[in-house]
């Protein structure tokens, strides 16, 4: 069996795709799988550490950009489609699965044009325009939420939920805390804002930290800041003498989850699925421009 999984740009698209890939590999040892994502995106290095083959497409989003940036993004569409068709001809997959992200639409559309079976997975309750359009022409649509079904042809829809990586389970708190250099008996707050970080969450924590005068003696922190705020946040914890592990991004998220008593994070669909599966108490902050 040969499959292409297309998606990336953010962890919300990539990690459910990885979960599916790992499950397929466990069920089909003969599986030959290729990930396709954004050229130069964070997914390339992350997938390489996991041993997955990857090819990149030049692509960029349109939403929320200035006019010139949008025009530049539009010029990448033809080259992205040509590149996708080239990948398809060389790899000859039995199926193409799209998980969203800038590169996913081009790859899935190429699959449709080449008459390869195609599937898209919609992680959110309110699908974006690209998936709504693709839903009309692909063979199957998998949705995480029942509410999303109304945006697609009923005969194509299957409610699957959001895939969660098996690696997140089975790590003990003691082992995880030791790997992070933290105290397994101390209350641990895990803060993260998705694969790119969340500036407002980082800012809110830094503003609140000085107010925790008594609690700081009993709390330790794990904080994924994103690349932008790394130095600022590290300095904030150091200035107050707070035990904290601060990184731009945690590839070993299983270790962070296993150590955490409480999560303070963005309410991304993939994150919520992981928190529910792990039974982690959480304070969720929705991103105002997503559903």
Model features per residue range: what roles?
Residues 112, 135, 257, 275-276, ...:
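Short alpha-helix at the nucleotide-sugar/activated-sugar donor binding site of glycosyltransferases
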Residues 13-25:
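Short amphipathic alpha-helix
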Residues 52, 116-117, 261-262, 279-287:
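Structural loop-to-beta junction motif characteristic of Rossmann-like glycosyltransferase folds
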Residues 2-8, 27-76, 227-229:
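Conserved nucleotide-sugar phosphate-binding/catalytic loop shared by glycosyltransferases and other
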Residues 36, 41, 46, 50, ...:
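Donor-nucleotide binding loops and adjacent catalytic segments primarily
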Residues 93-95, 250, 254, 258-271, ...:
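Acidic donor-binding loop of glycosyltransferase active sites
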Residues 53, 112-174:
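Active-site-proximal region of nucleotide-activated glycan assembly enzymes
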Residues 83-96, 104-119, 132-140:
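Glycosyltransferases and closely related glycan-assembly transferases
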